[in-house]
């Protein structure tokens, strides 16, 4: 949802320029003035650089801090301005995005739609989709804005990478093309499996990001779906060829528009660039047909042509494309084993691989595939799988570079509106009373509870380790009285925002089990009890 280009907003006495937006009714585009870069840094510029980290604003919960440095969002329609921000809980940079409403009444008319769309976006959890963290509304007397926090992508876009590759007179590696297509389709299949399906609607090589390790992430997942649940901005002529023919002709477009856009991305990835029509950058149909004919692989050509069918109903789904012969390969035992290890990594010590392999005979047989009569078995030696290479491969699998597509793909958790409190908060006057804790929505994947004796018969000490799904660890401790109510303690942790309401019953069971184990063992030589559970 963001690019790795940034610039500093300069404070001035003049008002920012306000332009009308062609997106949702009531939205305005605020374009603050920005600095231009010069070769020699003046004292004023040095001072501006020092001010980049200045905190301009904080989120209501205090976790997100907006900085002065603006992030370039030229390819993300619907976002009026975006700034670098700091996640004070994780200690990482994020993007502070703002959507402006020209009048407060325009926001009020769309408030429920805004909540529904953004509640859905927060639920999205996929390694190949830029993470959407949080949102809230800032409603004032005569205007309103919606602010949402997204993952900061410091890497460049796929378009930039393809341009560099062509400039260096290189061709696209077929394995890389397959790997990228698989990651993009895995993300699209995830979005399209939502109920109702989430249509990206703005998929181009400019809104796909590639990291240094080859990980692909699609960004700008429709913040302006508050209007039609799809992106409708077709301002930039250079990207018009990414939009399906039915755009603008039908009221309700389907997920097939994303398949058409993906097909165009796949073609551009294969040929590096589709030549436009002179300076206008407009890409005519003839140029697209010529680019397809340049493809030497007939399977690759057929794959792309299926995506670019003019009739939406004839285009395959993202799931079907993952099984097309141009992409699909039976997953190797190595890949299956890696996914199994990654899925149970909380049960495996960090240095387990190194400990297991350091004393092994590298000439020994690691695995063997038996063969028929008269044929030699196929053997894999330990020397063919060095520990460092395995560590790198496991890290790539963990990051989402090699998704498993032959099995059920991850499905999004559907938000339950009656249970999940909307993060939109109304404006309030600051008072000395403490604000209520932020509601926790992340799932706990690992819980560990330890109880030890402090004063015999008077009190015990409880320590709780919680590992959340985004790898955040919480370490909590308190004194536990003999007559303490375990359900009340679990409910208090929910109220304070340490765990989600969905994990309350699991935590209650863990606390009760640990306490029972402690009571059973404290008469022996042991004065402590520990229980661990994982989801």
Curated annotation (Swiss-Prot):
Residue ranges of the TM segments: none
A single cellular component GO annotation: cell cortex
UniProt domain Protein kinase: residue ranges: 68-327
Compositional bias annotation for Polar residues: 1-23
Residues recorded as bearing Phosphothreonine in the entry: 431, 433
Bias-annotated ranges (Low complexity): 27-42, 414-432
Tissues/organs with expression: Expressed in Paneth, enteroendocrine and precursor goblet cell lineages in the intestine.
Residue spans of biased composition, Acidic residues class: 43-57
Keyword Repressor: no
Region described as Disordered: spans on this chain: 1-70, 409-437
Modified residues (N-acetylserine): 2
InterPro entries attached to this UniProt entry: Kinase-like_dom_sf (IPR011009), Prot_kinase_dom (IPR000719), WNK_Ser-Thr_kinase (IPR050588)
Pfam families: Pkinase (PF00069)
Keywords: Acetylation, Cell projection, Cytoplasm, Membrane, Phosphoprotein
Positions where Phosphoserine occurs in the chain: 2
Subcellular locations according to the entry: Cytoplasm, Cell cortex; Endomembrane system; Cell projection, Lamellipodium
Domain notes per entry: The protein kinase domain is predicted to be catalytically inactive.
Subunit structure: Homodimer. Binds to MLF1, recruiting a serine kinase which phosphorylates both itself and MLF1. Phosphorylated MLF1 binds to YWHAZ and is retained in the cytoplasm. Interacts with ELOC/TCEB1, ELOB/TCEB2, TSC22D2 and TSC22D4. Interacts with the Elongin BC E3 ubiquitin ligase complex via its interaction with ELOB/TCEB2 and ELOC/TCEB1. Interacts with SALL4.
Family classification: Belongs to the protein kinase superfamily. Ser/Thr protein kinase family.
Name of the protein described by the UniProt record: Nuclear receptor-binding protein
Organism field: Mus musculus (Mouse)
Biological classification of the source: Eukaryota, Metazoa, Chordata, Craniata, Vertebrata
